[in-house]
Amino acid sequence: MDFSTLCIHGNIEKYDNTGAVSVPIFQSATFAHPGVGESTGFDYTRQQNPTREHLENVIKKLEDGVEAIAFATGMAAISAVMELFSPGDHIIAS
């Protein structure tokens, strides 16, 4: 798939319950589950939601990667990156 096509159609999903032809923006803070001990994969929006999951899947395909992680804030991203390094390590960033 061409790069520009992949940007638009990289992770096409059907939203049968809504009839949406593009990814809806899920703003729910919490999600209902079918029953006790049965999860839909989404519990709380700040942890994960269908909109962010879609974005991560598109970025993963665009970068030909294995995984992608989108953060809610820049500080969340910085904190996660800092956890990967040890005292005395050097980070070069621009």
Model-derived regions, located:
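N-terminal glycine-rich, Lys/His-bearing helix-loop that initiates the first secondary-structure elements
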Residues: M1-F42
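Conserved N-terminal alpha-helix of the aminotransferase class I/II PLP-enzyme fold
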Residues: T30-S79, L84
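PLP-dependent aminotransferase-like
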Residues: F85-S94
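Structural motif
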Residues: P24-I25, E67-I69, D89-H90
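Short, electropositive, low-hydrophobicity segments enriched in small/polar residues
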Residues: V23, I78, I92
